[in-house]
Amino acid sequence: HSQGMFTNDYSKYLEEKRAKEFVEWLKNGESKRQGMS
């Protein structure tokens, strides 16, 4: 039971981490596109 809770928390943590990385990637892409123009 506690193992399931841990896995659930861990997957939530991974999702948040992925979302933050995605936002950073978007920001980097935006600045690169603006720098090119």
Swiss-Prot record:
GO terms for cellular component: extracellular region. The keyword Secreted applies. It is found in: Secreted. Belongs to the glucagon family. The keyword Methyltransferase does not apply. Glucagon plays a key role in glucose metabolism and homeostasis. Regulates blood glucose by increasing gluconeogenesis and decreasing glycolysis. InterPro entries: Glucagon, Glucagon_GIP_secretin_VIP. It holds the Pfam family Hormone_2. GO terms for molecular function: hormone activity. This is Glucagon-1.
